[in-house]
Amino acid sequence: MKIRASVRKICENCRLIRRRKRVMVVCSNPKHKQKQG
């Protein structure tokens, strides 16, 4: 899980979601997991 100021999709499998007022990226590739902080 990477904590970043700006999250973006890395590949076509990445999906932007909102959880508890936080923008997150979930993907089938675990390296692409990101959280905005």
Swiss-Prot record:
GO cellular component annotations of the record: plastid; ribonucleoprotein complex; ribosome
Domain of life per record: Eukaryota
Location relative to the cell: Plastid
UniProt keyword Plastid, yes or no: yes
GO MF annotations in UniProt: structural constituent of ribosome
HAMAP family reported for this sequence: Ribosomal_bL36
Family: Belongs to the bacterial ribosomal protein bL36 family.
This protein's name: Large ribosomal subunit protein bL36c
Annotated source species: Aneura mirabilis
Gene: rpl36
